[in-house]
UniProtKB/Swiss-Prot annotation:
Record-linked PANTHER family: MITOCHONDRIAL RIBOSOMAL PROTEIN S5 (PTHR48277:SF1)
Record remark: domains: The N-terminal domain interacts with the head of the 30S subunit; the C-terminal domain interacts with the body and contacts protein S4. The interaction surface between S4 and S5 is involved in control of translational fidelity.
Basic and acidic residues bias: start-end ranges: 9-24
The protein's name in its UniProt record: Small ribosomal subunit protein uS5
Keyword terms: Ribonucleoprotein, Ribosomal protein, RNA-binding, rRNA-binding
Chain ranges passing through the membrane: none
């Protein structure tokens, strides 16, 4: 009788890792996955040092949904898989207009500060690695950013998430100000939004 393949041995597991790097399918939905940081952790025990790995992962659908997860395991693939699952549990929706954010916003976490500003279509994502990972997974294609304070990827990612969670929808801003939507959102952004809805 043939022995069952060991967990973590090549073949199918290697293929799974490749799928995670480029995006995976979950119940018919294709997700974008970005590994922001992998860190090796050493724990001192009686017999010596025991190593494990942590993975900071961002997952999104590229259409306004994004989440961040942190996984820990004895092997890198397992740590990434745990991070992906946690990120999916932490999904939240990001208000967008076209391919950019609705208004300027700032997020903070510990000593990390991230400033996000709307940008015109064609600008691209002007951001460093950790911030870029979150924005691209959320489906934001045009934005200006600035990171201040801590350069720790965990703080930067959490600050970016805090900024995105504090965004308001265009309709909410217009209602608070008692103005029509056209007076709150610049015309190019409204056109980009209409084109995105029409699939242009």
């Amino acid at each position: 009788m043939a022995a069952a393949p060991r967990r973590g041995a090549g073949g199918e597991r290697r293929s799974g890792r490749d799928d995670r790097r480029g995006g995976s399918a979950d119940k018919g939905v294709s997700y974008i996955e970005r590994v922001v940081k992998i860190n090796r952790v050493a724990k001192v025990v009686k017999g010596g040092r025991r190593f494990s790995f942590t993975a900071l992962v961002v997952v999104g659908d590229g259409n306004g949904m994004v989440g961040v997860g942190y996984g820990k395991a004895k092997e890198v693939p397992a740590a990434i898989a745990k991070g992906v699952e946690e990120a999916k549990k932490n999904f939240f929706r990001v208000p967008r207009i076209g391919g950019t954010i609705v208004h300027q916003v700032q997020g903070e976490d510990a000593a990390g500060v991230v400033l996000l500003r709307p940008a015109a279509p064609g600008t691209g994502v002007i951001a460093g690695g950790p911030v870029r990972a979150v924005l691209e997974c959320a489906g934001i294609h045009d934005v200006l950013t600035k990171s201040l304070g801590s350069s720790n990827p965990i703080n930067i990612v959490r600050a970016t998430v805090a900024a995105l969670k504090s965004l308001s929808r265009p309709e909410e801003i217009a209602a608070r100000r008692g103005l029509p939507l056209e007076d709150v959102v610049p015309a190019p952004m409204l056109r980009a939004r209409a084109e995105a809805k029409a699939g242009v």
